[in-house]
Amino acid sequence: MSLVKKFITVGGATLGSRIFGFARETLMAAALGTGPMADVFYAAFRFPNLFRRLFAEGAFNAAFVPLFAKEIEANGIDGAKRFSEEVFGVLFSVLLLITIVMELAMPLLVRWVIAPGFADDAEKFDLTVRLAAVMFPYLMSMSLTAMMSGMLNSLHHFFAAAVAPIFLNLVMISALFYAIYFGADPLTTAWYLSWSVLVAGVLQLAVVYIGVRHAGISIGLRFPRFTPNVKRLLLLAIPAAITGGVTQINLVIGQAIASGKEGAIAALQYADRIYQLPLGVVGVAVGIVLLPELARSLKSGHIKEAANIQNRSIEFVLFLTLPAAVALWLLSDDIIRVLYERGAFNANNTTLVGSILAIFGLGLPAFVLIKALQPGFYAREDTKSPMRYTAIAVAVNSALSILLFPVLAERGIALAEAVAGWLNAVQLFVTLYRRGHLVWEWSLARRTAMLLVSSAVMGGVIVYLSHRWEPLLGSGSTLLTKTGVLGLLILIAMAVYFIVAFLIGGVDVGMIRRNLKRKRPAPASDAKAVNGE
C-alpha cells in the first residue's frame, strides 16, 4: 500500500471519528448542556480516557509496533505470534490488576485527582465515583485493542485498526438518541452514556481481534512472563507514555482546577472536541509522512537528507495549522453556535465555549509541531529529552492555570495549555537545532513569513464577510442557514489562503507532493516503515 493510500485510510478514519465525535458532543450539549450532570460525566470519563491516551494509544503503539515488525523480519509470522502472546499475557494480567486497584481506590482518586472541587458536594462526588467505576474497565479493552491494532499495522492491514475508534462515538450516539427519544432525565442519560463507553470498548476489541484472525494470527493467552522482549517493550513505552500524553496531562490539570466552578469542565470539553479535529487529522499526516522518511534517511547515513525532511515537515505543519489557528480565533463563536447551540446549550454557553476555543486555536500550531519535532529525537533513540521537556511544560501549565483561573476562569486554563504547548515546541526545536539535526534555511524562514501573511489576508476576509453576514450567522437564523453560510465562509477563506500562499511563494506544489508521496520501499524494509505510521 502506498503512503498516500495509507494516509487516506488512517487519516480518513480519523476524520470520520472526529466528525462522529462532533455529532456526539452536539447531542450531549442538547441533552446535558454545561450543567452539573455534564460536569460529573466528563469528570468521570476523563480519567479512563487519560489512561487510554497515555498507555493504550501513543505509548503502546510507539513501543510495540517496532518490536513486532522486527520480530516478523527476524523470525517470521511464528516468531511474531510468539512475541505477541508473551506481550498479551503480561498486558492482560497487568491491566486486570490495575483495574481492580483503581476500582477499589476510586473514591480517593475522585477526591484528590479527578475532581477535587466535587468533594464539598456529596451527591456530585458520589455519582462521579460510581460513573468512573463503570467506565474504567474501558482502559483494559482499549489497551488490548491498541496492541492488536499495532499488529494489524505491522502486517499492512490498516482498515480494521483505523475504523475501530469510530465505534466509541457510534455507541455513545446511539445511547444519546435512546435517551432523548424516551425523554430521559440528565441523571439517567449519564448512566446510559457510562455503560455505552464500556460496551464500545468491547466492540472495538472485537473488531481488531477479528482483523488479526483474518490476517492469519490467532493469539492465545500465555502465563505472564517478563521475557527480554517484554522488558524492552516496557522500557520503550514508559518515556513514550509520559511524552505522548502531555496534552492529556494538561487537560487533567485544567479539569482538576476547573472543578471548582460549575460548568467549567463541560465548557472546556466542548471546545477541546473541536480543537482536536485539526490537531488529530494533521497529526496523523505528520506521523505517516515524517517518521518513515526520517528513519530511513538516518539509517542509510543521509544526514543532510534527514535534516531536509525535518525542515519540510515543519513547513508542511505550518502550512496547514497557521490558517486553522486564525480561523479558530475569528470564527470560534460561529462554529460553536452551529454545532452546539440548541436545547440546554444557550447563547451564553456559546460565548463562553467560543472564547475557550479561540484560545485553544492559538496553541494548535505548537501541538502539531511537537508531533513533527519529537520523531527527530526518537529516530536517534533519544526518549529522555522529549520527556524532560514535557515535564517542564506540565509544570508551567500547572502554575499558569492556578494563577490565571481566579482572573480568567476557564479561559485562563486554555491559555495556560497554549503557552505550555508553545514552550514544549520551542524547546524541541532549539535542541534539534543546537545538535545540528535541524539546519537553518532562509527559504524556510521566508516561506513561514509568507504563510503568516497569507493567514493574515485570509483573516481579513473572514472579518469582512463575518461582519457582512452577521445577521445570517446569528442566533436568530435557522440552523440550515447558519450552517450553509458558515460553510461558504470557510470555503472562501480556504480559497483565499491557498491562492495568496501560492502567489507570494508561501508554498508550492512540490512541497505538498514531497510530504504526501514516497516511493514504495523494498519488501525487506516495508515492515520498518510501519514504525512511523
From Swiss-Prot:
The chain crosses the membrane at residues 25-45, 90-110, 131-151, 158-178, 192-212, 233-253, 274-294, 316-336, 350-370, 389-409, 412-432, 449-469, 484-504. It is found in: Cell inner membrane. GO terms for molecular function: lipid-linked peptidoglycan transporter activity. Keywords: Cell inner membrane, Cell membrane, Cell shape, Cell wall biogenesis/degradation, Membrane, Peptidoglycan synthesis, Transmembrane, Transmembrane helix, Transport. It is a multi-pass membrane protein. Pathway: Cell wall biogenesis; peptidoglycan biosynthesis. The keyword Protein biosynthesis does not apply. InterPro entries: Lipid_II_flippase_MurJ/MviN, MurJ. It comes from the Bacteria. Its main location: membrane. NCBIfam families: murJ_mviN (TIGR01695). PANTHER family: LIPID II FLIPPASE MURJ. Involved in peptidoglycan biosynthesis. Transports lipid-linked peptidoglycan precursors from the inner to the outer leaflet of the cytoplasmic membrane. Belongs to the MurJ/MviN family. This is Probable lipid II flippase MurJ. It comes from Rhizobium tropici. The gene is murJ.
